[in-house]
Design a protein with these regions (language model features):
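Membrane-interfacial helical/loop segments at transmembrane boundaries in membrane proteins
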Residues: 75-96, 168-176
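Membrane-interface segments at the starts/ends of alpha-helical transmembrane spans
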Residues: 7-8, 89-105
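Hydrophobic cores of alpha-helical transmembrane segments in multi-pass integral membrane proteins
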Residues: 1-38, 43-72, 106-126, 140-176
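Alpha-helical transmembrane segments
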Residues: 127-136
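Cytosolic juxtamembrane amphipathic/interface segments immediately preceding
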Residues: 38-45, 95-99, 132-133
């Protein structure tokens, strides 16, 4: 069961992982080209790309990881192994092929928790490594709302995860 589930989950969530990769690529390109003289798109465009990566990257990463806990909409049919026309045993149950994960509320809770955790960790880095009293004071002030928002989204996700009905396979019938 392990390879069957994860082959679909990773393969089908291909588009979510590609969006995450796109975020990381635009970050790398933006850092490289934003200050270069005569860049094609202008400095502001590359700064917008950095903002997109800073927001979408952690949220998408969190939603992709949340699918491991919340599941995804696909069907496993082992009988298809014998079908020459369709030798794939797992198929997506909708035309979105895993992109719907980014719109599931519970997945977004973990995505937003990762986003606010990243911001809190960045502020802690500033506090510990920058020797500027003004920046440290602003970072300390901003750390409180970031931590509160992280806790709200993470605890919402965690409490729901602990209280939701789970699934199990009946060993006698093989039914879920």
């Amino acid at each position: 069961s392990f390879p069957l589930f994860y082959s679909t989950s990773f393969g089908g969530a291909y588009w979510v992982w590609m969006l995450i990769l796109l975020c990381f690529v635009i970050q790398a390109v933006s850092y490289e080209y934003q200050a270069k003289k005569g860049n094609l798109l202008g400095k502001k465009t590359y700064q917008v790309f950095l903002m997109i990566n800073g927001i979408a990257g952690p949220i998408l990463l969190g939603t992709a990881v949340a699918t491991f806990f919340n599941g995804a909409e696909f069907i496993v049919n082992k009988e298809q192994l014998t079908d020459v026309a369709m030798p794939v045993i797992s198929t997506w149950a909708n035309p979105w092929h895993g992109l719907e994960a980014a719109l599931v509320f519970w997945n977004l809770c973990l995505g937003l928790a990762v986003f606010f955790l990243a911001r809190a960790l960045a502020l802690l880095y500033f506090i510990n490594n920058i020797d500027d009293p003004e920046i440290v004071a602003k970072s300390r002030k901003q750390l409180i709302p970031e931590t509160i928002l992280f806790l709200v989204f993470f605890l919402t996700f965690l409490i729901r995860l602990l209280l939701v009905d789970g699934f199990a396979v009946n060993p006698d019938t093989g039914e879920v």
